[in-house]
Amino acid sequence: MIRPMFAFTGAAWLALAAGAPHAQSVFRARTDVVVIDVAVHEGRKPVGGLTKDDFEIRDNGVVQPVLDVSRESVPLDVTITIDISGSMTRKDRELVKGAVAQVSDSLKPSDRARVMLFHTVVSEATALSHPPISVDLSTIGLGTAVFDALLLSLISPPMVDRRQFVLFMTDGQDTSSSFDGSLAIETARHASAATTVVLVPSRAPDQTRGMLVSVAAQTGGEVIELKGHDQLSQAFLTALDNFRTSYMVRYIPTGVAKTGWHDVTVQVKSKNYSIRARRGYSVPN
């Protein structure tokens, strides 16, 4: 059954409209321990074999002692959000269903996933559950509420013992959102989930594309641009694998204020690798 998100997230919408991301961070942490998901690549290839001694973490400019790093040891919660506006053909819908099925096949038994659909309305098509998962794409809509859907994809309670990842697919042409991209960027700063935006095919105006890039970057994700839906399965699988094989770097903030916004930068000491990591986190007063 498809459940309209507006029906059970009204409080969240009111909070967002009031600018509430400042009031509560959903960043994943236990007591004083901060966890940063860090993707390390050499070219397009993930880099393995790194230890805590290879990483340099700066919290508000202060170098932090790294407690430990790990990979692939924590179950995933994956949100797949799909633009089903009228620009999608029947063939496109079949390709999207196939991409969701391939993601389902790649999940481990301990992982979970949900599927959200959006046009002018944002709906939860498949509730968060263990694999296998599937989705019915028999209905499409006219408008496209890209930023509304992105906001709802980002809103989820922090899970210390699980990693959260959003795969967000759209053509990027927003026609009917109630909220704008600036609120999506601010929400991303405080959200727990890393977010990869897949533009297929990209119709995003430059301003919208820039906002989507900012949302992804704030969370340690990326934007992938495809020419057609036939490339979607591989893009989904690659993005999911990149996230799964990223490092969880843990540290206890030292020498910085406990509350407020914390800028975080991550480097690998030994080599100039390409690194994606969230840009910071917030601790309520």
List the predicted regions and their residue ranges.
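Positively charged n-region of N-terminal signal peptides that target proteins for export
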Residues: M1-P4
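Bacterial N-terminal signal peptides
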Residues: A7-A17
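Scaffold/interface architecture of coatomer-like assemblies
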Residues: P21-N285
